[in-house]
A protein has these predicted regions:
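Serine-hydrolase catalytic machinery in alpha/beta-hydrolase-like enzymes
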Residues: 1-78, 87-91, 119, 168
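Short, conserved loop/helix-junction motifs that constitute active-site signature segments
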Residues: 6, 96, 120-127, 149-153
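Active-site nucleophile loop of the alpha/beta-hydrolase fold
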Residues: 16, 45, 103-111, 135, ...
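Catalytic histidine-centered segment of alpha/beta-hydrolase-like enzymes
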Residues: 51, 162-175
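Primarily recognizes the serine-hydrolase "nucleophile elbow" in alpha/beta-hydrolase
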Residues: 67-125
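Short beta-strand/loop motif that positions the catalytic acidic residue
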Residues: 125-127, 132-134, 138
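Conserved alpha/beta-hydrolase "acid-adjacent" motif
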Residues: 139-144
Length: 195
């Protein structure tokens, strides 16, 4: 199936387990990215769905899937997630062919914990164009460590000078959002999802 080019959107943003403590990430992204999409659905809006904010991965995935449009409109959606929100959006994208996925601080491995394939095994089969922005001092996995996991060829990993909390100065957020917008523009170009 050929996906037509066009303006991306809406964008759906999912925070990490620490929501609302990590709301600063969405506050940095929304004003920089929102105007470039046909709508912005943030974590607070998703949490207002009956059931509220449930940190469980399966519950959040079901909540997100219920909020997504059906039919051709789905292929214009961009999913953005931070930390566990990144895990949710990638799992959903394995089932729902959206236009692009953006991950910030993907939680590859709990600090000091054992490998948990449930965190990353699905990434090997992800067919949606995906950008992972990973902090060089992220305790859940650096960009170098990320490349040792089985990643689909549709996934790109870019380094950010940051930790897992993504405490970035305004110019660094500007640069990160330019990367995201460039990636989404490329993903919006016509491409065949059948091959």
């Amino acid at each position: 199936m050929i996906v037509p080019a066009g303006r991306p959107g809406p964008a759906f943003y999912l925070a990490g387990d620490s929501f609302p403590d990590d709301v600063g990430v969405e506050r940095a992204l929304a004003p920089r990215l929102g105007p470039h999409f046909d709508g912005w659905v943030g974590q607070a809006a998703l949490a207002d769905i009956p059931g509220g904010f449930d940190p469980a991965i399966a519950a959040r995935a079901a909540q997100l899937e219920a909020a997504l449009p059906e039919g051709p409109a789905l292929r214009r959606v961009v999913l953005i997630g931070r930390s566990s929100g990144a895990r949710v959006v990638t799992e959903v994208a394995c089932r729902r062919p959206v236009q692009a996925v953006i991950c910030l601080g993907y939680p590859f491995r709990r600090p000091g914990g054992p490998l948990e394939p449930a965190r990353f095994a699905h990434l090997s089969g992800l067919a949606v164009p995906t950008l992972i922005l990973q902090g060089t001092s992220d305790a859940y996995g650096t960009p170098t460590a990320a490349r040792f996991h089985p990643l689909s060829p549709h996934i790109q990993v870019q380094a950010l000078e940051a930790d897992h909390r993504l405490r970035l100065a305004a110019p660094d957020w500007d640069a990160a959002c330019r990367l995201i917008l460039d990636f989404c523009a490329h993903a919006a170009a016509p491409h065949d999802l059948t091959g």
